[in-house]
Amino acid sequence: MAYSYTEKKRIRKDFGKRPQILDVPYLLTTQLDSYRQFLQADRSEDNRQDVGLHAAFKTVFPIVSYSGTVELEYVSYRLGKPVFDVKECQLRGMTYAAPLRVLLRLVIYDKDAPAGSRVVKDIKEQEVYMGELPLMTENGTFVINGTERVIVSQLHRSPGVFFDHDKGKTHSSGKLLFNARVIPYRGSWLDFEFDPKDSVFVRIDRRRKLPATVLLRALGMETEEILATFFETNTVSITKDGFDMELIPERLRGEVAAFDFKVKNKVLVESGRRITARHVRELEAAGIKSLEVPAEYLVGKVLAHAVIDEDSGELVANANDEITDELLKKLRAAGIKSFKTLYTNDLDHGPYISTTLNIDTCRSQLEAQVEIYRMMRPGEPPTKEAAENLFNNLFFTEERYDLSAVGRMKFNRRVGREEITGPGVLDKDDILAVLKTLIDIRNGNGQVDDIDHLGNRRVRSVGEMAENVFRVGLVRVERAVKERLSVAESEGLMPQELINAKPVAAAVKEFFGSSQLSQFMDQNNPLSEVTHKRRISALGPGGLTRERAGFEVRDVHPTHYGRVCPIETPEGPNIGLINSLAVYARTNDYGFLETPYRKVENGKVTNEIVYLSAIEEGQYVIAQANASLDAKGNLVDELVSCRHANEFTMSTPDKIEFMDISPKQIVSVAAALIPFLEHDDANRALMGSNMQRQAVPCLRAETAVVGTGIERTVAIDSGSSIVARRGGVVDSVDAARIVVRVNDDETEAGEPGVDIYNLTKYTRSNQNTCINQRPLVNVGDVLARGDVLADGSSTDLGEMALGQNMMVAFMPWNGYNFEDSILISERVVQEDRFTSIHIEELTCVARDTKLGPEEISADIPNVSESLLSKLDESGIVYVGAEVKPNDILVGKVTPKGETQLTPEEKLLRAIFGEKASDVKDTSLRVPSGMEGTVIDVRVFTRDGVDKDKRALQIEEAALAAVRKDLKDQLRIYEDDIYDRVEKLLVGKLAAGGPNKLKDGTKVTKTYLTEVPREKWFEVRMRTEEVNEQLEKMAASLKEQHEAFETRFKEQKEKLTQGDDLAPGVLKMVKVYLAVKRRMQPGDKMAGRHGNKGVVSMIVPVEDMPYLEDGTPVDIVLNPLGVPSRMNVGQVLETHLGWAAKGLGQKIGRMVEAKAKIDELRKFLDKIYNHSAKKVDLSDFSDEEILKLCANLKKGVPMATPVFDGAEEEEIKAMLKLADLPESGQTTLFDGRTGESFDRPVTVGYMHMLKLNHLVDDKMHARSTGPYSLVTQQPLGGKAQFGGQRFGEMEVWALEAYGAAYTLQEMLTVKSDDVQGRNKMYKNIVDGDHRMEANIPESFNVLMKEIRSLAINIELEQD
């Protein structure tokens, strides 16, 4: 296996037994592909597919005027270049977006043309600006108003038809009432439902119900047609002396004989007996075609058609009439030879439609349409046209109704049709098919659907949601355009004047800015970013709501297997509604989730990979990834554990059709990062995967010594580390940028063969954590494409590194680890292991006020010199200044209104000048509880406002950086060109040149070194071909110089132009503070197995328990946290971590003892090739082996993949190899007494995380502060600088102690007794420590509320 540049430096030992058939796919594919398909920016304008923006335009255009003589057609669209790049947008608080321009064609037809023919009179084409469309960054996020946001995919109910029942809840009898619902992608919902009396009703858009036959009549069906569609018939002939019924023996089975069945005077079935299959066979054998039936048998049956007296033409009976004795007499009298009755029975041919027709009062199509109109538009008088229009618009016009391709596919599959394509609207056959299927289900043939099945729920990603929003915007525009089109011809308008793009832009802006699914990106660490982009939510517009979602929707469904993670979901009200995509899952063209499987043929597992959606998966038998295979890939066991039709069963190898691709297939990225996940209880695994997302990046990242092997993928795909775009050699490196000279074979002609990577330095993330990148390469290193060049936050040598590997001991320690508390050693704090940097952004805005402009300056009234010492002459703090609470960061003065002055003030003003008093100090100060270092200052100035000195300095520095980048590109390109020129010229005959080069002289290197490089192009050669090549090179160099100039000009223009600020803002200063947070008691820590706790105490190193060799442990955890929580994974991690660390120390000792390289190789071979996947180190040079050993000193990283990890024996073998006790336990000594503890203690290394719940952010105290306006009580919470609530239960406590005076004080002067607290303040100032309590304000509020109920309440004072 080939290792990348960083992988070589530190190889993980992998305990996985199963080969990796399929690499983990790029983790952000869903987001990127969806939006790419929406924009189709990379496709030419005439080659776009009918999806995304293109489809949205095509559905709304052409817009035709009311008269039909003018139409506006859509031709194509194009996206411009964004003005600012991603980083600039973040700094300036702008949206990263590209202008959208649409080419429209206005076609005017001749009004006077003869009817039926259209003559084009005029065509105008014009490009119209349609607002800006936000672009997705390469990491799958959007920058909206300067903040990074993610649009979460939505899991919603797929369009199509669904059959269900009410689970017996509607009616008290517990009878199951079946229903069918047709859900379109857009348009009205159509529901059919049974009532307890077995009639079928229809609802449109959940309005009041109508008999279902009303809808059928509205479609133009007559009673007879309806009956013929839904029922089979029996034919009855009227004979001289009775009635003969055509006999279909199959229909008799299971019925009770109402009369004696006679065959040739032999009674086959007696009256009152049930007809069995034997009787049916006998009847069939007898070959009887008809039976004589008594009249009583026919009474109560229903006629299938209208019966007309042929002689007189008189209507004898209507279709669906019930047969009575009178009717039979009438029929006989009218001379009717035969008639048909509906065949129904109570088992599987219910009379539902017939009973529905009986309650249906409509008799004609028009009546039915009017009835539907009344239901949809109550209170409006119906007309024939209105009723017809409304009905046709409901389900039969493309503008109002669309099933979508998915909906049509699901619809056709469900009603049992072969083809899966068709129109987006419904037709008569569709509605009949739904009704027939519903009746079949009611008759007991067929199953209801499971709406939580992932074949009935689909994923709506960014692109699709953006398209819908865009379409909505366009529809709003359409209405306005239609009205203006009528005047377009007379006034000679152009498309530009017809279209107002504001509604479109507003709809798009609203969606990206404030939709429920457009979320502020969780940027705590790279894992939380990746997870956020892979999240799938059932909430949001068109989805569920928290309150209405029941248990079933939230539950894990068998179809989640390999598609949605069963573990990772939030705790709390959203549990189960927000899920994460499984590692290998992807969405198909229809939006259903698919997961990959290996094909199995005749018991042999192939490497052919097939993606199956939940719909297809049910019909196959699928083996699990851990099924035993022999060397040839045949399934070995006689019975293999597998899944079929959503059930877990056992099956023989020959029946198996597919096999899982990997054991980690079923979990999400976060869960796949938990080692020994298979040994943890699911609830704790859920907490573990959620808490990894809250880990704060530490100052020095340290990758987990026990990992799962997926860490590198996550780190690279998250985009937090920098990956080489093309291979090459490192030309220069410093902390802020890396310059790579690209390999010749990877550059295209004419482009500079240089890649410059600017590193992100100390930037603030959305969660105020610090994003910082550090280079990993040195000058001269050879890189390949995809190698990691720089680590980001929480990555270490290109691997995810969320926390620190700590030496832990499981033992109680003086009660300081009671209830999950965590005891840590002072050494951890001293070594800054869990120190993190947090960056706060503070903003100062200078506005234009009524009294004059606010000013940013260092000239602030009544402020001491010492407070101004950190400001420069512009009044802005220096970068690098260390600031404390209440220090001034930006000096700002605001004009103050004129006030009446006392004579003394007038005198002072006369003596000391005006300035002091007409402005007040409104400077930006450091908030309380925050101290740190200023790391960056940004000044934004409105156009037309002079820039101050500081702004110009910042601008100059930015320009210098741009210039440096461009110069480096040019330098490398020049070097490359001159190298090629030298190769071209040396050794060839010249025809003349600078420095008196003679004709016929051979050009030498010496000659070229004497001539300045710029003059090499003046050399003329004998061969014309060489001269041509020289000219080409000279031209391309000139071209690059020009390109350099233009790019520099562009950048300069961008930097020097004024900023786009909010109205009324003249200047804005942003100051960034870096705050160092050390570990302290009260901070929350956690492992990766849901084992969380709060730091209770930091203990001096000398008091911590220590090992026999004197090593003190770092952390002491409570052993009682393991048994009841059932997360044993943490113990196994601890054991393996100890082995890994021990092996690293052993390698370190060997290196220090200057062991031979061969010995090192042998030892490494023992470690890596002990079991499972082999690592071949023979290709490594000695130097690489030494580098590897140096990196392994801190511990040999291990990977134990989920569900395929290290086994107990392997852990023991590793401990043995590291010369550690195989039990994983050792004797510890008490640091305070030096005595050994009674029993051996489990000790080892665990990867611990510091979570973003820091005591500094939560601790809060109030002396005086704001009060609520109505109740006059102090506000609550840290954000409002509120007080501590002395609540109901606290009052009980004081009452219980009888502390009446303390209680009175709490409820009055310390809370909301306004007079009392003012009086008390006065008393304290006067040194008089008495208090008088008055009526608290909240009592007055209560009195007012009671009075508002018209109950008078008064306070009588004695």
From Swiss-Prot:
Enzyme class: transferase
Family: Belongs to the RNA polymerase beta chain family.
Role: DNA-dependent RNA polymerase catalyzes the transcription of DNA into RNA using the four ribonucleoside triphosphates as substrates.
E.C. no: 2.7.7.6
Name of protein: DNA-directed RNA polymerase subunit beta
Gene Ontology MF terms: DNA binding; DNA-directed RNA polymerase activity; ribonucleoside binding
Catalysed reactions listed for this entry: RNA(n) + a ribonucleoside 5'-triphosphate = RNA(n+1) + diphosphate
One Gene Ontology term from the biological process aspect of the record: DNA-templated transcription
Source species: Thioalkalivibrio sulfidiphilus (strain HL-EbGR7)
An annotated GO cellular component: DNA-directed RNA polymerase complex
Pfam families, A to Z: RNA_pol_Rpb2_1, RNA_pol_Rpb2_2, RNA_pol_Rpb2_3, RNA_pol_Rpb2_45, RNA_pol_Rpb2_6, RNA_pol_Rpb2_7
InterPro entries according to UniProt: DNA-dir_RNA_pol_bsu_ext_1_sf, DNA-dir_RNA_pol_bsu_external_1, DNA-dir_RNA_pol_su2, DNA-dir_RNAP_su2_dom, DNA-dir_RNAP_su2_hyb_sf, RNA_pol_bsu_bac, RNA_pol_bsu_CS, RNA_pol_bsu_protrusion
UniProt keyword annotations, A-Z: DNA-directed RNA polymerase, Nucleotidyltransferase, Transcription, Transferase
Subunit structure and binding partners: The RNAP catalytic core consists of 2 alpha, 1 beta, 1 beta' and 1 omega subunit. When a sigma factor is associated with the core the holoenzyme is formed, which can initiate transcription.
